[in-house]
Amino acid sequence: MKKNIKNSIFAGECMVEVSGNTDNLYKNQIKMNLNFGGDTFNAAVYFSRLTNKLFNTFYFTGLGKDHLSEMMIERFKYENLKTDLIQRIKGKYPGLYSIQTDKKGNRSFSYWRNESAAKEMMKKCNLDNLEKFISNTELFYYTGISLGILKPKDQNKLIELSKKSKLTAFDFNYRNSFHGNKIKSQSL
């Protein structure tokens, strides 16, 4: 790392995004687009682009040891995101979502994240080393979705880790269908 450059950490889940026009579903082939997305990933990319000369932008998540996870890491590097904090978890994979757009242009989403490696990111990391690293970090960013994918014990660990940074940014990003219990979510 370069001297005098500050560190930032974005914690959450980057997912595989599948989108495209399914109007031709009954033909032999339909063309779909493959990309990567997610609230913390998108925020990290734009933060990195805006502050590239001033900040190292680290992405903290869990990924598998599969081809799509490798592609995702290459994309992180292309976007100048540091991959040192990525936890590699055998037998787990990136979450996936698809975007469907109806004839009026309204979008709807479907999610597959039961086997998401990001749900395990707190279990595989060395918390002592991560805590020391975060204490020298200018910004720690995470969202309600970052918490929502984790088990309660891991949610509390992430919240406690975030407090070690000089500045913590939290976007609640509440989704009723995802979080369910509003009172429990507000307590976090």
Can you say where each PLM-predicted feature lies in the sequence?
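Positively charged, low-complexity intrinsically disordered leader regions
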Residues: M1-L25
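Substrate-binding N-lobe of the ribokinase-like
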Residues: K27-L96, T101-N106, E115-E120
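Residue-level signal for short, function-critical loop segments
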Residues: C14, L63-K65, I145-S146
